[in-house]
Amino acid sequence: MKLGILGGTFNPIHSAHLRIAEEVRERCRLDRILFIPAATPPHKELAGEIPFADRHAMVAAAIADNPDFAVTDLENRRAGKSYSVHTLELLRQEYPRDEFYFIIGMDSYRSLGIWKDFPRLFELTNLVVAARPGSPCDDPLRLLPVVIQEQFCYDENAHMLRHQSGHVVIFLEETFLDISSTHIRQLVAAGRSIRYLLPSGVEHYIYRHGLYRSQERS
């Protein structure tokens, strides 16, 4: 099975996350997208101290009507920070026969050099880099850390990097929806509508459980 993997804090999950997942699934012909809420993100603070259980439940609500999407609590089942390389190693144990496609944004691609054990990522998975329309990456090899550049060759016709392991890095321009979790949290705190920014099931969960209401208004 070709399995797409999309991680994040999902605080909360919204329509931009879902649209990226759907476009990658379709264009890469994936069988399923697995959403992985981060338990303890290594590079950012978790705004609002929203428990993992709530963020996991919101993802479940968001994807409930899509049989091609699934969510896992994998990162909450282990101790320590939610490093992607460790998550992928655990997923490899759970799905030994599947072909992985790890979905990240262009900003994350540019900062791979600060990720824990980043060279190991390319041994574990293919990468799909989602970029905004009109912002193609002309020289994606040069954006990688110098220490691993020689492990890749650039296929200009396919617009992808090929790693010595056989895995690839695919670059896709995706529909850009200017929606952020931060803005949604601010709207809730200000008592304003968040309708149509996220699935109705997530909206109802937020209001039913009183999430984000105590955050600083801005």
From Swiss-Prot:
E.C. number(s) listed in UniProt: 2.7.7.18
Described by its record, this protein's role is as follows: Catalyzes the reversible adenylation of nicotinate mononucleotide (NaMN) to nicotinic acid adenine dinucleotide (NaAD).
List the HAMAP family hit by this protein, alphabetically.
NaMN_adenylyltr
In Swiss-Prot or TrEMBL terms, this protein is called Probable nicotinate-nucleotide adenylyltransferase
Question: Tell me, what is one Gene Ontology molecular-function annotation carried by this entry?
Answer: ATP binding
Pathway of this protein?
Cofactor biosynthesis; NAD(+) biosynthesis; deamido-NAD(+) from nicotinate D-ribonucleotide: step 1/1
Q: Which PANTHER family match?
A: NICOTINATE-NUCLEOTIDE ADENYLYLTRANSFERASE-RELATED (PTHR39321), PHOSPHOPANTETHEINE ADENYLYLTRANSFERASE (PTHR39321:SF3)
Keyword terms of this UniProt record: ATP-binding, NAD, Nucleotide-binding, Nucleotidyltransferase, Pyridine nucleotide biosynthesis, Transferase
What reaction(s) does this enzyme catalyze? Answer: nicotinate beta-D-ribonucleotide + ATP + H(+) = deamido-NAD(+) + diphosphate
- Please state which protein family the record places this protein in: Belongs to the NadD family.
Q: Which Pfam families match?
A: CTP_transf_like
Q: Gene encoding it?
A: nadD
Which organism encodes this protein? Answer: Syntrophotalea carbinolica (strain DSM 2380 / NBRC 103641 / GraBd1)
Which GO terms are recorded in the biological process aspect for this UniProt protein?
A: NAD biosynthetic process
